[in-house]
Amino acid sequence: MSIKSDRWIRRMAAEHGMIEPFEAGQIKQAAGRSIVSYGTSSYGYDVRCASEFKLFTDINTTIVDPKAFDPNSFVEVKGDSCIIPPNSFALARTVEYFRIPRSVLTICLGKSTYARCGIIVNVTPLEPEWEGHVTLEFSNTTPLPARIYANEGVAQMLFLESDEVCETSYRDRGGKYQGQVGVTLPKI
């Protein structure tokens, strides 16, 4: 497997709609102010968080069970930012919609700006031929409230291309998160 460069990312976005909307370079300012950067980097793509969040609350539940997840465990928040309570988490989605090629596995890593503040981004790999908005999970590991900004960079996607195409892709398996839009809760 090899990591793919900015040139490849730009070509795949232009010719195959791999990332929509797409920024060919790094965007570091908006409306005359500094922002957490997003767009194409040397060997990855920095994604943005949309302005819709699901903030975890323990008001309605006593146990978190991935096989019987209660949607009432979240409060919906819309806005330019979301404040995550101490030792809690929020779900969001990327602004960008992804279409992953059959020979590619995509890994998501958090941006250092957030990591240095105790905010961890968790996303599982984007498998070959998966498509959709990426659901992002932000964990606030600090004892203080933490802010996440919408429409600014929050994580980086790295594209790894295999030297051999997989026999069965995520689409072939009928993956349960295929084509997801919006913030998607756990499914069984």
Curated annotation (Swiss-Prot):
EC numbers on record: 3.5.4.13
Chemical reaction(s) catalysed: dCTP + H2O + H(+) = dUTP + NH4(+)
UniProt xrefs under InterPro entries: dCTP_deaminase, dUTPase-like_sf, dUTPase_trimeric
Residues that, per the record, bind dCTP: 111-116, 135-137, 156, 170, 180
Pathway the protein takes part in: Pyrimidine metabolism; dUMP biosynthesis; dUMP from dCTP (dUTP route): step 1/2
One GO molecular-function entry: nucleotide binding
Active site, renumbered: 137
Keywords assigned by UniProt, alphabetized: Hydrolase, Nucleotide metabolism, Nucleotide-binding
BP-aspect Gene Ontology terms: dUMP biosynthetic process; dUTP biosynthetic process; nucleobase-containing small molecule interconversion
The UniProt record lists the keyword Magnesium: no
Class of this enzyme: hydrolase
Similarity field: Belongs to the dCTP deaminase family.
Role according to the record: Catalyzes the deamination of dCTP to dUTP.
Record text on subunit structure and interactions: Homotrimer.
Protein name (record): dCTP deaminase
Organism ancestry: Bacteria, Pseudomonadati, Pseudomonadota, Betaproteobacteria, Nitrosomonadales
